[in-house]
Amino acid sequence: QLPIDMAVAHAGPWPVPGGTADDDIYAIYTSGSTGRPKGVQVRHRNVANLIETLRTSPGMGEGDVVLALTTLSFDIAVCELLLPLATGATVWLAGREDAADPDRLRALLSTHRVDVMQATPAAWRMLLDAGWQGDMALRAWCGGEALPADLAAALLPRVGALWNVYGPTETTVGSSRHRASAVDGPVPIGQPLQNTQFHVLDARGTEVPIGVVGELCIGGEGVARGYLGRPELTAGRFIDGGTLGRLYRTGDLGRWRNDGTLECLGRNDFQLKIRGYRIEAGEVEHVLLAHPAVARAVVVGRPAPGGETRLLAYVVPHPGADIEEETLRAHVAQRLPSYMVPQRCLALPTLPLTTSGKIDRNALPAPQDAIVRTSAAAPASGNDMLLDPDEARVAALFRELLALPQVDRDADFFSLGGHSLLAAQLAARLGRALDHQIPMRAVFDHPTIGRLAAWLASRTQDAAAVIPRLGAETPAPLSVMQQ
């Protein structure tokens, strides 16, 4: 509270805090390879440049309705909140459950007549798997991770425009964009935003010709200040490019195409993109090694059905130690966000090595070939060999979505690596198979094959018992008392 005498004594105008375009507007944290997250310092000028480009291309203005799905801890929320505020658009905020439930998401899109929605490829695929037919008035923005060609082909006939947006947090949300058209191969990341330059460099820092692969480095107005309180790390990633100016080394491989657009070819280090979030494999490894039973650990990303990346952890136990998969996943879940919890934690007697003595990540066995000490993924216990038709249907979807050759009847969907997006796909596919709407909540409430199949059977019986509605022209039968 301000004392009255101070307020009276202050006769002049109240001072306005000074600020410049070079001041920080926010700091947002990304995964760090040593287990310590990195705080990216983004300046006002960085965000202003982003807004000035995106308001015209892809485009957003007064009269547009934007559906915001993203948590504030994910930097693309800038496009869902600050960009609409700067352009006069209307923002509808989706709740956490709305964003994870395709049926609720479809209802929001329809009810609010949304013009612009930005989401990760996993979220767009979740909508399509739930039977969403699209909206030709919708401008779909896709970012956070690579846009698979098959997903782009499925979205194009269902939306008015499909934009692929690319850029790391260190260059302020987005650095390039591309309006997708006919898909005949990898979807390019397009051309740089205004006042932004892309350079494809070789190991010596020299620009490579068109078509040659190199590291994508970004310069211009989008480049952030650096990492908060991490001068050495800042110096390693934000470099002096000489005549090219100050550059950020993305760690992504890419090349220029003959049509003047850029193509991103993935990482050249151990960073991964999981459900739109960029993570350092080393951060997850650091947490695993803190478990008393773990002697060595390595974390990798492997392709999963639907174009997603599945996070797998391989561990070597200390001599005499017993490792259970569920215990390791719980250990990580207590210390890291849910998207950084490995879908599988697999025990090996040793880690494969290259001739130079480094871990050979390409030689790590597929999950079904590894030694797994866990009750949830133990060998089939006999009762899964006697599945009824309902259980067999659920079991087949468990195996497909989790990319597992065998799933026990009593194994928990989420202990085996399931997450909310996969749960939404499971509910949608079961709903199509049974011709009933299956809420995603059912998977959380009944996460095993046996329990979910029993719930589905009871729901089907309840649906069959519903009295059919008669048309207005059909006479209703009289009850005994009425007769």
Regions found by a protein language model. Give the residues of each.
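Short, conserved phosphate/pyrophosphate- and ester-handling motifs at nucleotide-, phospho-/glycolipid
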Residues: T120, G220, D252, H419, ...
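Regions immediately C-terminal to embedded phosphopantetheine-bearing carrier domains
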Residues: W14-G18, D24, W141, S338, ...
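Short acidic/glycine-enriched loop/turn segments that link adjacent beta-strands
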Residues: E170, P305-T309, H446
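AMP-dependent adenylate-forming
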Residues: Q1-G18, V47, A161-N164, R179-M385, ...
